[in-house]
Design a protein with these regions (language model features):
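Terminal low-complexity/charged segments
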Residues: 1-168
């Protein structure tokens, strides 16, 4: 019998108790949230557990939720168990004033580039990263372009009507 979302959630709850929250399954993929201080412990458990075996980091990215005071920035991990062909997603949140998350590069070498990209676009500082610097934008850039701090369109344009896009 293959690995199921119920088994994954049960093992995570058994290990971490109520520290992991917001469990939900969307389109067959289990998602949950973890405190940022636990990101490495959760990743290591998912990787090392003989049943879970989430040994492939599919993606790591950032998100900006400006309305969530104290947890404005999120890091989202997508992991894949190749043996049972099952994927999961989990998020850790941090405040925008001190956006520190522990690096996953010690466990997944692929996290190196993904964390640099996330730093470059969202300003999330990956503590312990071996080479955390901009990777796509110029070094002189003094802002993080994917934060929702900028208008979607040039406000002086008259050829676009925001009402047509549900923003008016």
């Amino acid at each position: 019998m293959g690995l199921t979302n119920e088994t994954i959630q049960s093992k995570l709850t058994e290990k971490f108790g109520d520290q992991l929250t917001a469990f939900e399954t969307t389109y067959g993929m289990l998602s949950f949230e973890a405190p940022k201080e636990l990101n490495l412990k959760v990743l290591n458990f998912l990787y090392d557990d003989d049943t879970l075996q989430f040994r492939f980091l599919t993606d790591l990215t950032g998100l900006h939720y400006p309305a969530q005071t104290g947890r404005e920035l999120a890091v989202v991990y997508h992991l894949h168990n190749m043996t049972d062909n099952i994927r999961i997603r989990f998020k850790v949140f941090t405040g925008i004033n001190q956006p520190d998350i522990y690096t996953a590069t010690g466990l997944f070498s692929a996290a190196n580039w993904m964390e640099r990209e996330t730093y470059d676009f969202f300003g999330i500082n990956f503590v312990g990263h071996p080479n955390l610097k901009r990777i796509l934008n110029v070094d002189e850039m003094d802002y993080f372009p994917l934060r929702k701090e900028f208008p979607l369109e040039d406000q002086t344009r008259i050829d676009k009507d925001d009402e047509m896009f549900g923003r008016g």
